């Protein structure tokens, strides 16, 4: 059997074949259908925007699964935070934990979103950026030892959706022209620009948006103002949000109280002195403060010690300068160059019980500074569309952590990871070779990206705070070396126009995920010496290899026939060198303890331990019935479906492929919308169906690794039940400049859990059972909003 399908059972191969056959049938039908264009444009004016859509395919004929969501589509989805942006995406979801829950976090870890899951990979394996500037990684939870694998203390939610004119979503390993390399995809938040609102004949714009969301009793007020002409123009955007805890629908335990507010502003200017240069400057700022309090439990999870009170602050500052040079001469067509800076701060201050009779304050921070530049060039020569680029960035991170009053040797928590500095340099070249085959366009697109990263620790002496057994020389011996790697990432795509409006493609790409600072330098218990020869610690590994992937995808996108659009893809990805923790003992593995401090006798060390594969398919379609029946012009249907399967296997003796718990269950979305353009109103009904799933536990994180074979786990995770949910929305253009909109979400008040955020819930203790209640998603909620545009 080919290595491509190694580890897949015949049943799974059969399922994949069925999916591929179904899409192939659709392609064959499309190739023989009328190659006419869609009668109704996908980009309508604000007066005819549908209230809710499942995204339709892009018109751009480019291989791969990349979609874009406009500011109008975000409003239609009721997208008012990090998670609701992906409300109607079949294979994308936001992961996180609810306030007060211990699932995947400690008593001093903040609640909220940790990142996105795309096609089964999540959090730090999915890139996030604002205007191309990468957002910080989610912090690992080394202070809870190996149990913290794939859970995070401080997440990646540094954004306000109102600030963005577009969100680009790349599924699967990133393309060669993407400087922020990730094996799981990328989500790029694009700030609004003056060009989004101004055009010849319209030199000013003012917009005001106000809306209310009952799920967390939040109010939002946003202002967008733009002015200028063809030479000089600018924009200012401000957003303010105030809210409380997000209510659950458990009927057993209310969400713990929270009160939060956020401010965001952005301003940018464009100077276009001539036809060849377009210079832009952008400044943006985001700050959110959250106050919360919740129960704090003993180690058994059966007794509440008291109430923890937490203040979390999240800040991001950004600045960039860019020049778009478009001479269209014999050497280049365009050259885009940009420099940028970003500073982020995350501060969690928690006053919490340290025992049944004492309290402590935990200060947990994560700060980063990013400096970078990128440049990209394009030139068309005959049938060749050549492009290339260079990029470089420097990221400094700090992880301050302390407890007050000074804890005992039994309860001290060391700084979770060393401060670090990371350099990344990359470049790419790509060629699109266009060929005409009997009036059908065909293109071959080879490309390659080369990436180099160097990460090294700084100020390692901070890891010795409050330790009598550890000094700077011990930490320097363990973590003193830098982690460096160079990756060559080739890709090739073939695309063919079945009709003038429908294309099919086949592509291969290689992906890479460099080790992050938590994996390299994360530590717990390293400075402790209270347990004698039973003393153990979790340690990072500066010698980690880069996680890599091979990604194969075949798809079709465009118009099947007039009035019917489609975007479908089937994919298979295999991964190696996944990072996890392996147990070693000083007596059994002395070679692993050469640089480990002498007070430690057992380690759980980060290693490239696992390999995995994920395969699946997704399809979305939009049908405009008015194309054939004039009487129902304005009636449309949206359909989307996503299916994935995956498994992972460690290098332990006797291990086997076990279902990958980060792979989400099957999901389908069906929507029906009516838009009356003449009267300026519309309504939509959207149903979401998700299959139930139970994650499979393994013993990999508790395995003794003493020469015996690994056994199956007896841990019983909660089966997350499937559900069906209905949303209803409507809008009304009261006047040319005023629009009212609203929606009812979870109309039937369905009690349900999000699988990706609830998959490791158990019912062993009272705290576990409380976590199940806290994880229930909101019941019936509503949103109301008004938009005023001039």
Regions found by a protein language model. Give the residues of each.
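Extracytoplasmic beta-strand/coil segments of soluble accessory domains associated
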Residues: 83, 87-138
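Short acidic/polar hinge/loop motifs at secondary-structure boundaries
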Residues: 116-117, 133-171
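C-terminal beta-signal and adjacent terminal beta-strands/loops
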Residues: 138-139, 512, 576, 689-705, ...
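A beta-strand signature from Gram-negative outer-membrane beta-barrel systems
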Residues: 153-207, 789
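Transmembrane beta-barrel wall of Gram-negative outer-membrane proteins
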Residues: 212-242, 252-293, 311-326, 434, ...
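Flexible loop and strand-edge segments within Gram-negative outer membrane beta-barrel domains
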Residues: 256-258, 276-332, 343-368, 403, ...
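Outer-membrane beta-barrel signature, preferentially recognizing the C-terminal barrel domain
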Residues: 306-328, 366, 416, 420-422, ...
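Gram-negative outer-membrane beta-barrel transporters
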Residues: 383, 435-438, 444, 451-453, ...
């Amino acid at each position: 059997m080919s290595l491509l399908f190694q580890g897949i059972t015949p049943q799974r191969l059969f399922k994949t074949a069925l999916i591929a056959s179904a899409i192939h049938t659709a392609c064959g039908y499309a190739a023989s259908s009328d190659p006419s264009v869609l009668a109704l444009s996908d980009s309508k004016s604000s007066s005819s925007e549908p209230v809710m859509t499942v995204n339709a395919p892009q018109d751009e004929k480019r291989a791969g699964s990349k979609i874009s969501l406009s500011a109008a589509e975000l409003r239609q989805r009721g997208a008012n935070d990090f998670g609701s942006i992906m409300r109607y995406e079949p294979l994308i979801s936001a992961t996180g934990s609810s306030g007060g829950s211990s699932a995947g976090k400690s008593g001093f870890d903040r609640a909220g979103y940790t990142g996105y899951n795309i096609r089964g990979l999540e959090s730090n394996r999915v890139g996030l950026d604002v205007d191309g500037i990468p957002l910080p990684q989610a912090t690992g939870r080394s202070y809870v030892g190996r149990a913290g694998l794939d859970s995070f203390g401080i997440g990646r939610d540094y954004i306000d959706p109102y600030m963005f004119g577009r969100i680009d979503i790349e599924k699967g390993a990133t393309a060669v022209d993407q400087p922020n390399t990730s094996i799981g995809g990328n989500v790029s938040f694009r700030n609004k620009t003056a060009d989004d609102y101004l055009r010849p004949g319209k030199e000013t714009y003012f917009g005001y948006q106000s809306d209310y969301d009952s799920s967390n009793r939040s109010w939002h007020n946003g202002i967008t103002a733009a002015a200028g002409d063809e030479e000089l123009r600018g924009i200012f955007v401000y957003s303010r949000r105030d809210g409380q805890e997000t209510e659950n629908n458990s009927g057993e335990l209310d969400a713990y109280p929270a009160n939060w507010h956020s401010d965001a502003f952005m301003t940018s200017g464009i100077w276009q002195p001539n036809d060849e240069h377009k210079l832009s400057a952008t400044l943006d700022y985001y700050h959110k403060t959250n106050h919360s309090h919740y129960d704090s439990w003993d180690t058994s999870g059966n007794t509440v010690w008291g109430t923890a009170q937490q203040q979390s602050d999240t800040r991001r500052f950004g600045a960039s300068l860019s020049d778009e040079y478009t001479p269209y001469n014999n050497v280049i067509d365009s050259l885009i160059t940009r420099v940028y800076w970003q500073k982020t701060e995350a501060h969690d201050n928690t006053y919490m019980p340290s025992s049944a009779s004492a309290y402590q304050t935990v200060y947990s921070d994560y700060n980063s500074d990013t400096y970078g530049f990128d440049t990209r060039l394009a030139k068309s020569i005959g049938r060749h569309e050549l492009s290339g680029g260079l990029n470089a960035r420097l990221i400094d991170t700090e992880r301050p952590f302390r407890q007050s009053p000074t804890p005992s040797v039994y309860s001290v928590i060391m700084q979770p990871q060393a401060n670090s500095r990371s350099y990344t340099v990359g470049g790419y070249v790509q060629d699109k070779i266009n060929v005409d085959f009997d009036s059908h366009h065909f293109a071959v697109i080879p490309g390659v990206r080369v990436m180099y990263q160097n990460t090294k620790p700084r100020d390692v002496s901070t890891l010795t705070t409050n330790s009598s057994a550890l000094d700077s020389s011990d930490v320097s011996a363990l973590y003193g070396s830098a982690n460096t790697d160079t990756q060559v990432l080739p890709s090739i795509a073939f695309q063919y126009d079945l009709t003038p409006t429908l294309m099919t493609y086949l592509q291969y790409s290689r992906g890479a995920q460099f080790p992050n600072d938590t994996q390299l330098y994360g530590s717990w218990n390293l400075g402790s010496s209270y347990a004698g020869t039973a003393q153990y610690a979790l340690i990072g590994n500066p010698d980690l290899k880069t996680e890599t992937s091979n990604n194969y995808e075949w798809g079709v996108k465009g118009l099947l026939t007039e009035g019917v659009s489609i975007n479908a893809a089937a994919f298979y990805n295999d991964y190696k060198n996944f990072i996890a923790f392996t147990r070693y003992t000083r007596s059994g593995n002395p070679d692993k303890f050469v640089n480990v401090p002498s007070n430690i006798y057992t380690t759980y060390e980060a290693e490239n331990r696992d390999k995995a594969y994920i395969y699946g398919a997704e399809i979305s379609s939009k049908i405009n019935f008015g194309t054939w029946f004039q009487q129902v012009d304005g009636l449309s249907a949206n359909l989307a479906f996503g299916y994935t399967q995956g498994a992972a296997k460690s290098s332990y003796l006797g291990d086997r492929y076990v279902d990958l718990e980060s792979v989400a269950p099957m999901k389908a979305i069906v929507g029906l919308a009516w838009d009356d353009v003449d009267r300026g109103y519309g309504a939509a009904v959207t149903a979401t169906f998700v299959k139930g799933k139970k994650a499979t536990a393994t013993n990999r994180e508790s395995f003794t690794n003493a020469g015996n074979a690994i056994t199956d786990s007896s841990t019983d995770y909660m089966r997350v039940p499937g559900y069906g949910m209905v949303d209803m929305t409507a809008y009304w253009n009261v006047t040319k400049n005023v629009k009212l909109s609203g929606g009812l979400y979870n109309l039937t008040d369905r009690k349900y859990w999000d699988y990706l955020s609830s998959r490791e819930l158990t019912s062993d203790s009272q705290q576990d059972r409380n976590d199940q209640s806290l994880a229930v998603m909101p019941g019936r909620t509503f949103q109301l909003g008004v938009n005023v545009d001039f």
